[in-house]
Amino acid sequence: MSFDTFYNIITGQPRSARETTSGVNPLDRSSLWPAPVATGNDVEEAVRSAQEAFPAWSEKTYKQRTELLEKFADLYLVHANEFCQLIATECGRTAGNAAIEVYVAAQWLRYPSKYEIPEEVTEDEKKTSIVTHEPLGVVAAICPWNFPLMLALGKIAPALATGNCVILKPSPFTPYSSLKLVELAQQVFPPSVLQVLHGHDDLGPMLVKHPRIQKITFTGSTTTGKQILRDAAETMKRVTLETAGNNASIILPDVNIEAVIPQLAGGLWFNAGQVCIATRRMYIHQDIFDEAVAQLAEASKDLASGMEPIQNEMQLVRLQQALSDANAAGCELLSLGKTEAAEGFFIQPTILKSPPPDADVVQQENFGPIVSCIKFSSLDEAISLANNSDTGLAASVWSSDVSAARRVAAKLEVGNVYINGPPQPDPYVPFGGHKQSGLGVEYGLPGLLSFCQTKSTYLYK
């Protein structure tokens, strides 16, 4: 299979288009390969063929479907080197960081096979009640640009395992790995069970509004998530949303600073901060504040010098504006060194020291290598500051006293709390956000069941 020509995949076949777009290499702004732009007719054909494939696919047993996912995982890993090169190119990653995504993503293909979809039976004097979980039908998976493979597979695998057919829509900034992923999948799955469409900004709304698509699963911005909710309401679609998170870390005064700071730095700057659960706001106890910030800046310098670019120019401009606004507001900016290749979408990683907690740069999610460090004097203050956000995706707590850290975690208004370790998702653990960070959960058994509809059958005696 060639990894330098790209097609939409409809009805199991590669499909070119009259119109194409080309991505941009974030390292040097050079144009990448042409990718076909799907039309409204392509959407109709993909949905129709998915509907036709659904009965036979949904009638397979859960075990049969997960065995095919395992087979696909094996085939995918045979081509891991090609996917590593593709991710490195379209995302601007180092080879090592590209490999992290490619190999970790395979775990999401395998995790459904560790579960069974439950059937619950209860009985009383009058009847037996049976609760089953059935596939929905056609699912549209709308994916972002920061981890195009892993986040796509995190939606594809549970949807297919539970008997649905999937139409994948990658970000127009990073279509290439998704197009190749689905092309490769045709060697394993029946035609039209898994399709992919790349297109302009009108493609997502076409899928969301389509009356014969039963569910939308989306990862991306809160603004787009809200629009999806509005558009999906017309047909009462099931919706799972994972949206923005202005994530907080709380560092208690009893931590071993020398042990904790390198872990914090690694989590902050991985993938140039383009991680949905990365820390954006760091609340540090006043007794260790100056030392912790100084050590964080020092520990970050080596990481910052080799930092990758922002994936696209649109996001780069947003981050540049955030830093400009912070500077104009008088915030103290600790720049961690200049990046080497100025031609690409590079930005200096920056620590904001003691910005006002209500400043725009603190309250908005800066999806990139910018972190605000703010001191607190009491646990109640730290918890209040951390919860002072419209979003609630993730948080972390650092303390030598695990019991104290757990008490803090219990009061944080977020979907995911990481104690004494950097934020990392786990395919076996439900993942979702509170407040405006999303609806529903992905991963684990609850994530699998989110692709099902529940049926209760009553057998009267």
Curated annotation (Swiss-Prot):
Does the keyword section mention NAD?
yes
Database matches in InterPro entries: Ald_DH/histidinol_DH, Ald_DH_C, Ald_DH_N, Aldehyde_DH_dom, LUC3-like
CDD domains listed in its UniProt record: ALDH_AldA-AAD23400
Q: Where are the transmembrane segments?
A: none
SUPFAM superfamilies noted in UniProt: ALDH-like (SSF53720)
Binding sites annotated in the UniProt record for NAD(+): 220-225
Q: Which Gene3D superfamilies match?
A: Aldehyde Dehydrogenase, Chain A, domain 1 (3.40.605.10), Aldehyde Dehydrogenase, Chain A, domain 2 (3.40.309.10)
Q: Which reaction does it catalyse?
A: an aldehyde + NAD(+) + H2O = a carboxylate + NADH + 2 H(+)
**Highest rank taxon of the organism:** Eukaryota
- GO MF term set: aldehyde dehydrogenase (NAD+) activity
Report keywords, A-Z: NAD, Oxidoreductase
Q: What class of enzyme is it?
A: oxidoreductase
According to the record, what happens upon gene knockout?
Does not alter fusarin C production.
Tell me, using the record's free text, what induces this protein. Expressed under high amounts of nitrogen via regulation by GLN1. Moreover, components of the fungal-specific velvet complex VEL1, VEL2 and LAE1 act also as positive regulators of expression. Finally, expression is induced under acidic conditions in a PACC-independent manner.
The active site lies at: 242, 276
Q: What is its EC number?
A: 1.2.1.3
Q: Which family does it belong to?
A: Belongs to the aldehyde dehydrogenase family.
Protein function? Putative aldehyde dehydrogenase; part of the gene cluster that mediates the biosynthesis of the mycotoxin fusarin C. Within the cluster, FUS1, FUS2, FUS8 and FUS9 are sufficient for fusarin production. The other FUS cluster members are not essential for fusarin C biosynthesis.
The protein, known as: Putative aldehyde dehydrogenase FUS7
Species this protein is from: Gibberella fujikuroi (strain CBS 195.34 / IMI 58289 / NRRL A-6831) (Bakanae and foot rot disease fungus)
Q: Which gene encodes it?
A: FUS7
